C-alpha cells in the first residue's frame, strides 16, 4: 500500500512535467497500462519509450491534478487534466481518471479512463 507521501510525490513529478522520470521511478519493471479498453502496454521500459514518443509529438504537455488522489489500500484513483500543445500552437485538453494498483510504493497497473472525443477521435 503506498503512503500518501509517495502518491503526492508521484503526482508532483507529473505536474512538474517529468513524465518519463515518474515512470522510471514509480512503476514496477513489469507494470502494465491500459488506455480505456485497449490492449495493455507491458513493461516499464516500453511505457517510458511510449511516453517519450508522446512527448516528442507535441511542443508542450502539461498535467494538473483535479482534486486529491483517493487511496484505498493498494488502489489509488486520481482525476487529471492534460493539455497537449502542437507545434502549430493548437492545444487539446483531456480530462481522465487514472486508476492505479500499487505494489508497495510502485505502480503495478494503471488504467486510464477518458472520452476519446476530447482528442478529436
Task: Report the location of each language-model feature.
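Hydrophobic beta-strand positions in extracellular immunoglobulin-like domains
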Residues: 82-84, 102
Amino acid at each position: 500500500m503506498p503512503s500518501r507521501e509517495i502518491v503526492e510525490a508521484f503526482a508532483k513529478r507529473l505536474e512538474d512535467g517529468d513524465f518519463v522520470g515518474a515512470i522510471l521511478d514509480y512503476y514496477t519493471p513489469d507494470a502494465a497500462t491500459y488506455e480505456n479498453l485497449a490492449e495493455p502496454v507491458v513493461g516499464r521500459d516500453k511505457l517510458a519509450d511510449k511516453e517519450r514518443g508522446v512527448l516528442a509529438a507535441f511542443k508542450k504537455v502539461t498535467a494538473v491534478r483535479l482534486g486529491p488522489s483517493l487511496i484505498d489500500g493498494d488502489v489509488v484513483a486520481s482525476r487529471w487534466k492534460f493539455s497537449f500543445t502542437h507545434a502549430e500552437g493548437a492545444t487539446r485538453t483531456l480530462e481522465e481518471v487514472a486508476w492505479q494498483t500499487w505494489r508497495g510504493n510502485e505502480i503495478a497497473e494503471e488504467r486510464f479512463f477518458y472520452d476519446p472525443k476530447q482528442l478529436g477521435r
